[in-house]
């Protein structure tokens, strides 16, 4: 499945994406300073390798699953590529409960985005991808949309607020990153502010 949106394309995961993902996990890792960095701190090389091996196995299963998946089967995320075909990142959705904790059960639809490819940043691709993804979720009947980040990720906060997300819940001091304490933030999309944002981009 593919969704064309401005300068980017949202598409399913492909087997050819695995090599780039491995690069992002092993050498081009700057993005990990901002995308849930607490998950990477204090992890030994042995643990990293074990996690990478499991990750590669997961990605192989993803590629197999999406290879023949009909377009009418709902997706919980997409890969992001430029119109020229360069793979630059991904966006996804997951559920949180009323306390803003991730849950495997049905809950509040929460979205996230990662663009590890540094050369692709600052070009508006994140906005285009999120607009397209929100549009897709709305087509699936999802009207109430949330977004989570942490108080040290100023770029993500700026994107969220500009798009019309309003702070919904702040959990003070629950994240420790590089020795400092940060808040966990949950935003909720304000439909009117989001509509105004979209009108301004036309």
Go through each PLM region and give its residues.
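GNAT-family acyltransferases
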Residues: 1-118, 180-202
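Positions that flank functional sites
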Residues: 40, 152, 175
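Conserved catalytic-core motifs of GNAT/GCN5-like acyltransferases
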Residues: 98, 146-149, 166-183
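Conserved beta-strand-loop-alpha-helix junction that forms the acyl-donor binding cleft
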Residues: 116, 147-157
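PDZ/PDZ-like domain micro-motif
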Residues: 119-120, 175
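Conserved acetyl-CoA-binding loop-helix of GNAT-fold acetyltransferases
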Residues: 122-139, 154-162
């Amino acid at each position: 499945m593919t969704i064309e949106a401005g300068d980017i394309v949202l598409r399913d995961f492909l087997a050819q994406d695995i090599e780039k993902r491995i690069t992002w996990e092993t050498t081009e890792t700057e993005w990990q300073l901002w995308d849930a960095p607490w998950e990477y701190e204090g992890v030994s090389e042995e643990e990293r390798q074990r996690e990478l091996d499991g990750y590669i196995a997961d990605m192989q299963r993803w590629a197999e699953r999406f290879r023949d998946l009909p377009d009418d089967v709902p997706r919980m995320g997409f890969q992001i590529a430029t119109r020229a075909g360069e793979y630059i990142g991904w966006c996804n959705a997951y559920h949180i409960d009323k306390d803003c904790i991730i849950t495997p059960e049905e809950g509040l639809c929460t979205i996230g985005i990662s663009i590890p490819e540094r050369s692709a940043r600052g070009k508006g691709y994140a906005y285009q991808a999120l607009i397209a993804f929100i549009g897709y979720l709305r087509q699936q009947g999802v009207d109430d949309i949330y977004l989570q980040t942490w108080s040290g990720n100023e770029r993500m906060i700026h994107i969220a607020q500009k798009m019309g997300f309003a702070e919904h819940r702040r959990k003070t001091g629950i994240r420790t990153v590089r020795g400092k304490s940060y808040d966990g933030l949950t935003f909720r999309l304000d439909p009117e502010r989001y509509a105004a944002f979209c009108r301004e981009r036309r």
